[in-house]
């Protein structure tokens, strides 16, 4: 069966998306949500373009320690936007209501908690933290505050992903014992655009990270160096493991094992190819395969139960009944349910954030679920770097070998 939009919403009824492309109580021109953007690399500029498509907000300030990027962001925000290199100037501005944080991972905790302390609502990219301890601190502080904090795991605000959750909850898959996740990218190192060092505050870029000399590969591809990011595990697996947590109603694995190597990009610290396996409560396991060698097939998840399989990615959802699949020699069945993505999940996710700023309700990707997803990624990286399986002690909140 091919689901159209009408049958989609019928199937997904009872699950609140928490998103609206236009709000009934949208604020007027003098009552808009005034937003500053801290860290204006490519992802942050993409988020800015999404915000410009949504009603009731205004981009009023941009901050980056590298002037050329700050000026690129200012072109998006508009000529009247304030331009600063020190993020604290945005947080000190009482006329700014909220901030978008698009910095490298190692800055996420500090700027997010500074923003919350300053009374700002926050949209911070994933992973929300650079370590498990950072994430735990963020949960404690943010949940004790009155601020709205949304994290960039946009699947939680994306229509066909919400339908996927409804299918899982319906029991149509039977007993789910295996979830396969994968994400393939294509990347190269070297041939970097020259950096104008007179326009970069490298010390401020490093911030809480260890002091070290400037290297262009660390500036441009910081995700793949342990001082600043967590490689393809925290960059990519975090999205999918958040979906696993959400769909399966779990918040942490029992244990993790991982292996990886730099087969193609020797310059990086973090491996360009990784496999990880995670054992979960509720008698199921999940795997992750990630590589930066080839982008063919991109990324997605497969939930396998004894009655059926759900395959989902950012373009579509497909449910397969398993009746014929167990007969030797038969081909895989045609999908019983097929839904193609009807929109942009980042756009609806940012709308959810704006709506929650107005209503003061909990956003779809709130700090606790964001921490749980990042924590599982950090656990997988701990196993990867240790070279053996590690266990998670959920009572003591610590990793055990």
Predicted regions and their residues:
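N-terminal secretory signal peptides and thylakoid transit peptides that target proteins
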Residues: 1-15
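N-terminal Rossmann-like dinucleotide-binding module
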Residues: 11-77, 155-158, 244
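Nucleotide donor/acceptor-binding cores
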Residues: 31-33, 147, 177
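Conserved SAM-binding strand-loop segment of SAM-dependent methyltransferases
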Residues: 81-86
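N-terminal Rossmann-like NAD(P) cofactor-binding module of classical short-chain dehydrogenase/reductase
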Residues: 99-100
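Beta-strand-loop-alpha-helix segment that lines the small-molecule cofactor/substrate pocket
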Residues: 104, 109-157, 171, 387
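Contiguous beta-strand/loop segments that form the cofactor/metal-binding neighborhood of enzyme cores
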Residues: 162-163, 172-175, 180, 187-223, ...
């Amino acid at each position: 069966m091919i689901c159209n939009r009408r049958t989609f919403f019928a199937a997904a009824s009872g699950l609140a998306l928490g998103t609206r492309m236009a709000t009934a109580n949208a604020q007027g021109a003098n009552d808009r949500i005034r937003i500053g953007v801290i860290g204006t690399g490519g992802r942050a500029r993409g988020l800015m373009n999404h915000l410009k498509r949504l009603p009731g907000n205004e981009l009023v300030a941009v901050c980056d320690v590298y002037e050329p990027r700050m000026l690129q962001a200012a072109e998006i925000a508009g000529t009247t936007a304030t331009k600063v290199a020190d993020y604290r100037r945005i947080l000190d501005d009482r006329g700014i209501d909220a901030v978008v944080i698009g910095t490298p991972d190692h800055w996420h905790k500090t700027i997010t908690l500074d923003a919350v302390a300053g009374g700002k609502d926050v949209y911070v990219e994933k992973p929300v933290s650079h370590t498990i301890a950072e994430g735990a601190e963020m949960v404690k502080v943010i949940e004790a505050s009155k601020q709205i904090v949304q994290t960039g795991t946009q699947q939680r605000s994306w229509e066909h992903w919400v339908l996927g959750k409804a299918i899982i909850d319906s029991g149509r898959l039977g007993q789910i014992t295996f979830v396969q996740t994968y994400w393939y990218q294509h990347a190269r190192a070297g041939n970097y655009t020259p950096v104008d060092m007179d326009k970069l505050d490298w010390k401020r870029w490093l911030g809480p990270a260890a002091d070290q000399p400037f290297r262009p590969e660390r500036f441009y591809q910081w995700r793949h160096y342990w001082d600043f990011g967590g490689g393809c595990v925290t960059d990519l697996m975090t999205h999918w493991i958040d979906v696993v947590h959400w769909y399966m109603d779990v918040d942490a694995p029992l244990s993790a094992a991982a292996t990886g190597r730099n087969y193609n990009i020797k310059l990086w610290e973090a491996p360009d190819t990784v496999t990880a396996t995670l054992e979960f409560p509720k008698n199921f396991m999940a795997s992750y395969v990630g590589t930066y060698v080839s982008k063919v097939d991109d990324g997605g998840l497969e939930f396998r139960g004894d009655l059926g399989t759900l395959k989902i990615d950012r373009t579509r959802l497909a449910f397969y009944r398993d009746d014929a699949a167990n007969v030797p020699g038969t081909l895989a069945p045609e999908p019983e349910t097929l839904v193609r993505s009807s929109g942009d999940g980042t756009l609806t996710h940012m709308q959810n954030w704006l709506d929650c700023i107005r209503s003061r309700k909990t956003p779809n990707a709130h700090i606790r679920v964001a921490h749980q997803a990042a924590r599982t990624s950090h656990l997988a990286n701990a196993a990867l770097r240790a070279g053996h399986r590690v266990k998670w002690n959920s009572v003591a909140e610590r990793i055990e070998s």
